[in-house]
Structure formats: C-alpha cells, structure tokens
Design a protein with these regions (language model features):
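Conserved beta-strand/loop scaffold segments within soluble protein domains that form the structured core
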Residues: 50, 60-61, 66-72, 78-347, ...
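Long, low-complexity, mixed-charge
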Residues: 1-87
Length: 390
C-alpha cells in the first residue's frame, strides 16, 4: 500500500529513495522489554516540561509535566475534547501523513487564550528497535488560542541495529496574535528513518518560528505545509542538515499566502559529505488577493566530497501584483581563498576546513533564541564536524 502511494507521487518523490521505506519488511513496533531513562540520551536534558513516545506509545515514566494554568499536554490516545481539535484530512500529496492519521497515540498540546507556557515543552519520539525491522506512527496536535505563547522542542531518536521507521503527522493551529517557536531536532541512528508531515495554519497577526535541525540518520523526509490565512501573520522557517556517509534528507515545503500583508522568511542550509544526499524543494504560493505579501526563500549548500549530491528547487507561484518576493539556491564547495587565509595565519589545513564548515552551519544554530538548547546544538554541531583529511 505504501509503495503504491509513493509511486503515485512521481514529481514530489522524484529525488527521494522510497526504497528506504519500502525495502525492509517493517512490522508494527512492539513494547520494549525495558524502558531506559532519558538522561544522557536526549540532546538537552534541562528543566523543560517533557513528554515522550516510545515506539509510538505514550510513556508515563518519561513525563515531567508541572504545567501552568491554561497549558495542557496529553496523550493523543486519551486526550479530552478531541472533537474540538483539527480534523481535516491530510493533503492528497502527503500520503504518509494520511497513513499516520490512523495512529492511536501521540501528543496533544493546548495553550488557552492569552496563556503562556512558563518553560519550553520537550516532546521526544524514540524508536527502540528489536532484532527485526519495526515501524511506528504518531499524531501531534498543537493548538494555541488567540494571544497564547509557547516554545516547543521536538526531538526524534532511534536506538538499536535493526531498521526503524517513525511516521508522524503533525498539525499546528495558531489563533489570532498567537506565537509559537517550534524546534525540530533529528538525531536518528544508522538505521533510523523518519517521515514527518507538518501542517501549520496562522490566523491574523500570528507568528510561527520554526527551526528544523538534522544531525543525522539513514533517511529523513519532512513535508511542511504552512497556510497564512490571517492578515499580517508572520512565518520564519530556518533549517540545517549535516549529512555524511550514505545519509539522506529531504525537505519539502509549501507556504501558501492567502491573506493580505503576510511575511515569510525561509533559509535552509545543508552540509553534505561522503556519499550523502540532500533535497530541498521550497515553494511559496501567493494567492489572488494576498497583496502586500513579503516573502523570501533561500537554500545554501556546502559539498565536502565529490560524491555528495544536492537537488535544490526554491520557487514562487505568484497570483497577486503588489508583492515583494525573492528566492535563491546555491551549491558550492569550500572557498580556497578562505582556506588560504586561515592557513596563512598559522591554522592547520584540517582545522581550517573544520572552522569554515562550523561557520557555515553555526549561522542557523545562532538563530535559536533558547539559550540552553543553543548551547547543546553548538556541541552537537562540533560533534558532526568532518574527520581529518576530508
């Protein structure tokens, strides 16, 4: 069924190796024999509110939720008032999100009108693979009512030597004047696969700030849909992928401006080494009547080997005449002039290369305003620097 659905998406999956998902004989993930503590496993083990899914199931042992009034985090399987939550079917061109819609568990986050989450909310997705290939699905629903504010950190992890696949459908709804800062951190293992379908809707003057950071995994694909429905809404989409070996990452995004005066700023960077591959497809659609739209989409890529590959396609579809829209894509190798400059200052060749790679990636880490997370991401960035003689 999955193979047929992906085969029908010829254009959107043209550069994506679907065999990573259809090749293994995935079985539904079971309950692990033991639940290991999160300490030392998550990237940022600080005093955030926290909830976790293990193999697609809410794990009460990992929940640390002393939430203020007006803020709730519940398991999808037993959340109250599900009938009031978003229930639109997933878009037709997101077949994996359609499949994940049938998931039995996940996270439901709600922030009431003018309420504020006092600390970031950390949602952890963990795959504990057994000796066989296993898959899990999950739902994530985040609703901020008018004037609400929250910071969300989602982290995906996989452990074990067997193939694992997490398939997640997420829906974010921001009411008038609401603000969500949404961090998504991918730290999959050598056999970890992640597919995410994320739909975001913004009402008037709502603000959505996204940071998507990929620190590795065999396969990751994110399909992001943002719909700016209210006047004056703002959307900032930041991303960084650090890939090596035979890793693959694919970022597909569509931002649809429907209302007057919306703003989008998108910048996604990737560092690709060895035989890794990266795909970026970023479309901004400006609908009729969405005058005064101010939108930009850029993708910048740094190749560290002759075998690394990038496919990039930032684009616009504009059906309004009073707009400001800019886009660009770049693929390049390390600057020989910059290398020569650093070496002329007494820095060794390998260290000079690592400094340049770090400088390229650190721009996206520096955009993270949450200080404990920024420090943890900087350490993770150091850990993903190329080895000597690259």
């Amino acid at each position: 069924m999955i193979a047929e659905a992906l085969a029908a998406q010829k254009e959107g999956w043209r550069y994506t190796p679907a065999a990573a998902l259809t090749g293994p004989d995935f079985k539904p993930a079971g309950v692990p024999e033991s639940i290991l503590p999160l300490g030392g496993r998550v990237l940022c083990p600080v005093g955030f509110h926290r909830a976790a899914l293990v193999n697609g199931r809410w794990e009460a042992k990992h929940a640390v939720l002393k939430l203020p009034d007006g803020v709730t985090v519940e398991p999808f399987s037993s959340a109250s008032g599900l009938g009031d939550l978003p229930n639109k079917p997933a878009p037709a061109d997101m077949p994996l999100a359609q499949a994940a819609s049938a998931a039995r568990d996940g996270f439901v986050v709600r922030v009431a009108r003018h309420a504020r989450a006092d600390r970031p909310i950390h949602l952890v997705h963990i795959s504990e693979a057994s000796s066989a290939a296993e898959s899990s699905a999950a739902r994530v629903i985040v609703v901020l009512e008018p004037g609400a504010t929250a910071e969300l950190v989602e982290e995906t992890l996989s452990f074990g030597d067997a193939p694992s696949w997490k398939n997640v459908r997420a829906q974010v709804v921001l009411g008038e004047g609401a603000f969500l800062r949404h961090h998504r951190i991918v730290r999959e293992g050598a056999q970890g696969r992640l597919t995410l379908g994320l739909e975001v809707t913004l009402a008037s003057r709502a603000r959505y700030e996204s940071h998507a950071l990929n620190f590795g995994g065999l396969f990751a694909r994110e399909d992001l849909r943002v719909r700016i429905e209210g006047e004056g809404a703002e959307c900032a989409l930041n991303g960084l992928a650090l890939l090596g070996g035979s890793e693959f990452a694919d970022h597909h995004s569509v931002v649809e401006h429907v209302a007057v005066g919306g703003t989008t700023r998108q910048l996604y960077k990737a560092v690709i080494d060895d035989k890794a591959r990266f795909v970026f497809d970023g479309l901004i659609s400006v609908r009729p009547g969405a005058q005064k739209t101010d939108a930009q989409v850029y993708n910048k890529n740094l190749l560290l080997s002759e075998d690394a590959r990038v496919n990039t396609n930032p684009e616009f579809k504009i059906l309004a005449d009073d707009v400001s829209c800019k886009h660009g894509g770049a693929v390049g190798q390390m600057s020989l002039e910059a290398l020569f400059y650093l070496q002329s200052r007494g820095i060794g060749a390998d260290e000079a290369r690592r400094l340049l790679v770090y400088a390229f990636g650190s721009e996206m880490v520096d955009r993270v305003a949450l200080e404990p997370l920024k420090l943890a991401l900087a350490d993770a960035l150091h850990g993903r620097m190329p080895e000597e003689n690259f």
